[in-house]
């Protein structure tokens, strides 16, 4: 959430940000917000004036009664009217503040100055790579669907029977390979990269979604259980960030870094017409998430560190990849800056997104009220929050199966995963 003081002082800058994000239609929200803010200021002043009048006259009434100069009934009657006015103003103020908050919640984050200008994903910029690793694929490669079916690793048909399209079933060595990936990533991030592992709930309340920015902007993308007021998480970022919602963090404990595995659930509303075969677009997938809470001046250094931690996984697995910087028209509403890591699919002959690494600056912390006191004293400030997929397994599995296949239809297990799987080859 943006600081309303910043919006008051820089309304045109906010509108320019909306233009860069291809959200110029939301510019009237800025004017409406400032109008409501001015109304609130006037209403607060009127309320304060009436309360001051009531306090002053209450003292006069007490003095009249104490000195025996009368009953003060006329003044008491007037103050009852004043109290009724104050009650009406308080009610109106509460409604107005709710409207202001809802407007603030719908505005996207500021963009970092280094975010490139662009209208869509076609204008994203290569940041690093391509990073290549040698794989002997001098034969007609099979795609992950054919490999998964022929080797008994994946069963999309039975997943569709059980739940619906986009809910895969891992079977046999496919299930063990998936679990090996998750455990390898968690172990690497906790042992080598300094993250504390957490295992969060897969269901959250609306306050948690609001805190990380998925609500109300992306309400149509989450699965909702209305009877319980709960939502299936789209990413572990939501519960892990909300671990510290409403808390004052200790300055000397920053940065705080968590790594968490979770299943992720996304409705993928609006994906009609996109390639939804196999793992290319699913409603449920597994992911290891990295979440960081930092001092503001350290957050862009932390962004590069998180990116390097995600890259380290791909380097260990020897999966070819590249890193792109998302342009202003493609970056998520919550992020101030974002990198995407894309893995190469030889069968699809294209890159597939496997990770996003984002700096939200104080956007989530302001929504979630996560603060710290610099030096342990003084005025509290909002921390900066960051997150990165480290990594999502679905498209990673696509690239892994396709790169590690052999001419005779087997899959060689990456060396770093063999201690986890207990086997070297899938046949």
Swiss-Prot record:
Domain of life assignment: Bacteria
Annotated localization: Cytoplasm
Pathway(s) annotated for this protein in UniProt: Aminoacyl-tRNA biosynthesis; selenocysteinyl-tRNA(Sec) biosynthesis; L-seryl-tRNA(Sec) from L-serine and tRNA(Sec): step 1/1
Principal location class: cytoplasm
A molecular-function term among this protein's GO annotations: ATP binding
Residues that, per the record, bind ATP: 266-268, 282, 353-356
Swiss-Prot/TrEMBL catalytic activity: tRNA(Ser) + L-serine + ATP = L-seryl-tRNA(Ser) + AMP + diphosphate + H(+); tRNA(Sec) + L-serine + ATP = L-seryl-tRNA(Sec) + AMP + diphosphate + H(+)
Entry's free-text remark on domains: Consists of two distinct domains, a catalytic core and a N-terminal extension that is involved in tRNA binding.
UniProt cross-references to PANTHER family, sorted A to Z: SERINE--TRNA LIGASE, SERYL-TRNA SYNTHETASE
Entry's family note: Belongs to the class-II aminoacyl-tRNA synthetase family. Type-1 seryl-tRNA synthetase subfamily.
Protein's UniProt name: Serine--tRNA ligase
Organism of origin: Chlorobaculum parvum (strain DSM 263 / NCIMB 8327)
Gene that encodes it: serS
